[in-house]
Design a protein with these regions (language model features):
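Amphipathic alpha-helical packing segments from all-alpha helical-bundle domains
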Residues: 97, 118-145, 151-165
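Secondary-structure edge/capping motif, primarily at the C-terminal ends of alpha-helices
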Residues: 81-85, 110-117, 138-144, 171-175
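Helix-turn-helix
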Residues: 31-65, 69
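C-terminal peripheral helix-coil segments that are non-catalytic and often amphipathic
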Residues: 1-5, 136-140, 170-195
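N-terminal intrinsically disordered/low-complexity leader segments
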Residues: 1-18
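Hydrophobic alpha-helical connector segments
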Residues: 82-109, 119
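Generic hydrophobic, amphipathic alpha-helix propensity
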Residues: 16-28, 45, 70-74, 78
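Terminal helix-turn-helix DNA-binding modules in bacterial transcription factors
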Residues: 29-34, 39, 76-88
Length: 195
């Protein structure tokens, strides 16, 4: 399920390759709104995108590689922005709400991605984006904990990220508004840090 293979055009900066990639990702988003990943095949995707199978395989090794690229396009920039402005001492609820607003109109597609083989790879990317930020946020509180070392900070950061990610995914499954998801995550944050 490699997304990028040497010689593939999925990461090319050539305008034609970018247009093709955009068409494939757009087609995948559209199909994911009504089809679980397990029901999608390359033939459906290329038909929806208006490209040939040959062109598809010039960009991606398989369907799951494209689904992962689609999921990354849907959330990666939003998570990077969230990590950049993250601070649990400021308006965390607003930050979560802004993050979830990026998925408005794409909940069905997001649920199908959550239920797909690429879900764990996508979660790993979220952890990679959020871990340094969360680690530093927790470091500022480490004086309150006896024996807090780097391993404990990493473990706690991973724990917080996974728990938050679970709440976000459950909110999407339930069709909750970005504001409701933000409120729920904020309530949990307050309890965990005893505010």
């Amino acid at each position: 399920m490699n997304q990028v293979v040497p010689g593939r055009r999925s990461e090319s900066t050539d305008p034609r390759a970018l247009r093709t990639r955009k068409a494939l990702v757009g087609a995948t988003v559209a199909l994911l709104k009504t089809h679980p990943v397990a029901e999608l095949n390359v033939s459906q995707i290329v038909k929806e995108a208006g490209v040939s199978r040959q062109v598809f395989y010039q960009h991606f090794t398989d369907r799951d590689g494209l689904v992962l690229a689609t999921a990354q396009d849907m959330i990666k920039e939003a998570y990077e922005g969230f990590a950049a402005r993250f601070s649990s001492d400021r308006d965390f609820e607003a930050a979560v709400t802004a993050l979830m607003t990026t998925l408005t109109g794409h909940y069905e597609a997001a649920v199908h991605i959550i239920d797909s083989p690429v879900h764990s790879m996508l979660d790993q990317e979220v952890v990679a984006i959020m871990l340094p930020t969360m680690r530093e946020e927790l470091r500022s509180r480490a004086d309150e904990w006896d024996g807090a070392d780097e391993q404990l900070l990493d473990d706690m950061a991973s724990f917080y990220i996974a728990g938050c990610q679970h709440l976000l995914e459950e909110g999407v499954r339930e069709g909750a508004s970005p504001e409701e998801i933000g409120r729920r995550v904020e309530l949990v944050r307050r309890v965990l840090i005893r505010e």
